Amino acid sequence: MAELLAIKWDDNRDKLILLDQTILPNKIEYIEYDTAEGVYDSIKDMIVRGAPAIGVTAAYGLYFAAKVAPEDKFENFFKYLKEKSSYLDSSRPTAVNLSWALKVMESKALENKDKDVKEIKSILREEAKRIHEEDIEICKTIGENLITLLKDGVGILTHCNAGQLATSKYGTATSPMYLAKEKGWNFKVYSDETRPRLQGSTLTALELYEAGIDVTTITDNMAAMVMSQGKIDAVIVGCDRIAANGDTANKIGTMGVSILAKYFGIPMYIAAPTPSIDINTKTGEDIPIEERNPEEVTSRFGVWTAPKGVKVYNPGFDVTPHENITAIVTEKGIVYPPFKENLKKLFEK
């Protein structure tokens, strides 16, 4: 079984290589990119998806923009860079890692404003690679922290894809699953199908199956049943943005899963790289929620599944109230309620 990586970097050819996640699980194909415009399209069209992976991809996209930026003086170079940063940031408004990575790249350019512009371009190349490598380490550490909350024989429910395909490697929510397999644990994963784009069945189930992990796909409306049957000991999901009070935006349907978990007394864990925590966003009400193409709901695989012309509401995300969350697990440690106080402490370390 082959290891599936969402993001690859070809250092010799200066190209970003992305797994086309829109055609999984039927085809495994990679697409090469070397322009900011191409990277924008890859994020907008969900060739690449998942907040950490989007952030890494955007960093490379801004480097590609820097490559063709004016070189006469820093002011002109940085003006162009800022314009392209705003352009890339508009591709997916909910994932905070996107704006975080772009700000890191902008700051790196400003730190080196007294250097030759050609040298700054090389520095930005290395910074994008550093963000990529850091994401791998973050994901592994999140897994190491999460696995301390689990035990051999555990039954896990996950929603959408916060796996290796949503990050540079390991995933966030799936990281403890890969580590548990390495330890030889006997455990079972239930993967919500995740309507309407089916990331749970086409992505999470695929990557776990390819890794030899015991995974079972269920439709979203089966989650209550498997919980009631005692098959689930923990719910682990990723996130796209966490507000200062712990409210968490994640793929549509996550809030419903959290309500079920609370009802059945099952712990709900959020796997979260610290770049996904937005201390400047006070509550979930302040998180922008992307609305997507209605045809994601009304048609699938070229077949209409609803009357043509029917009204459709298709938010890509919902917000899980902090009251429903047992713990937020980051690379810096496990955060328990009260989240408003304890999340802030992460950034004081």
UniProtKB/Swiss-Prot annotation:
The active site is at 240 (proton donor). Pathway: Carbohydrate degradation. The lineage of its organism: Bacteria, Bacillati, Bacillota, Clostridia, Eubacteriales. It holds the Pfam family IF-2B. Catalyzes the isomerization of 5-deoxy-alpha-D-ribose 1-phosphate to 5-deoxy-D-ribulose 1-phosphate, as part of a 5-deoxyribose salvage pathway that recycles this toxic radical SAM enzyme by-product to mainstream metabolites. It catalyses: 5-deoxy-alpha-D-ribose 1-phosphate = 5-deoxy-D-ribulose 1-phosphate. It comes from Clostridium botulinum (strain Hall / ATCC 3502 / NCTC 13319 / Type A). The keyword Isomerase applies. Substrate binds at residues 49-51, 92, 199, 250-251. It is an enzyme of class 5 (isomerase). InterPro entries: Deoxyribose1P_isomerase_DrdI (IPR043679), IF-2B-related (IPR000649), IF-M1Pi (IPR005251), IF_2B-like_C (IPR042529), Initiation_fac_2B_a/b/d (IPR011559), M1Pi_N (IPR027363), NagB/RpiA_transferase-like (IPR037171). Keywords: Carbohydrate metabolism, Isomerase. The keyword Oxidoreductase does not apply. This is 5-deoxyribose 1-phosphate isomerase. One of its GO terms (biological process) is L-methionine salvage from methylthioadenosine. Its EC number is 5.3.1.-. It comes from the Bacteria. One of its GO terms (molecular function) is S-methyl-5-thioribose-1-phosphate isomerase activity. HAMAP family: Deoxyribose1P_isomerase (MF_02229), Salvage_MtnA (MF_01678). The record marks 160 as: Transition state stabilizer. The gene is drdI. NCBIfam families: eIF-2B_rel, PRK05720.1, salvage_mtnA. Belongs to the EIF-2B alpha/beta/delta subunits family. DrdI subfamily.
